[in-house]
Amino acid sequence: MELKSTLLDDKAIKRTLIRISHEIIERNKGIEDIVLIGIKRRGYPLAQRIAEHIEGIEGSKVDVGYVDITLYRDDLTIVEKDPTVKSIDIETTIKDKKVILVDDVLYTCRTVRAAIDAVMDLDRPEGIQLAVLIDRGHKELPIRADYVGKNIPTSKNEVIKVMLNEIDGEDSVKIYDSIN
């Protein structure tokens, strides 16, 4: 893969997550009954960071959990037929709560659909919202994010790589040309 450009650096990612945190608070008229569920791998640390920003703004904690989807990742170029849920971990009930799924890249929406199914199989939330750092287009399902860090129209030959300090040792979002 050939690097085309860096779309977001560490400061831009932080600003973006702070903005998304404010949008979540505003849209939900506070943080009562909100639960953040990160879609592993990189959605989980993003959900934790958003929870920290919300706590700093509102002075109250937000519960955070994760759902682990396997066999398909929107941020990879190889697509399997159907994603499956490997595990879901949340230490609070989601019944009658506002669940906000958090992911790094929204692409075809198949991973998000699997995460929604996992949440609904777990319990009956009041509603499900979606926050993503990057929306790159090419949706195959009628799903849209409620909170978007940055819209990056891409070709199918391009790859968006989100790197997070917790996993990769740095914070950045880069776009690459896929060399076939």
From Swiss-Prot:
It catalyses: UMP + diphosphate = 5-phospho-alpha-D-ribose 1-diphosphate + uracil. GO terms for biological process: DNA-templated transcription termination. GO terms for molecular function: RNA binding; uracil phosphoribosyltransferase activity. A motif (PRPP-binding) lies at residues 99-111. Its EC number is 2.4.2.9. It comes from the Bacteria. Keywords: Glycosyltransferase, RNA-binding, Transcription, Transcription regulation, Transcription termination, Transferase. PANTHER family: BIFUNCTIONAL PROTEIN PYRR (PTHR11608:SF0). Homodimer and homohexamer; in equilibrium. Belongs to the purine/pyrimidine phosphoribosyltransferase family. PyrR subfamily. Regulates transcriptional attenuation of the pyrimidine nucleotide (pyr) operon by binding in a uridine-dependent manner to specific sites on pyr mRNA. This disrupts an antiterminator hairpin in the RNA and favors formation of a downstream transcription terminator, leading to a reduced expression of downstream genes. This is Bifunctional protein PyrR. It comes from Clostridium botulinum (strain Eklund 17B / Type B).
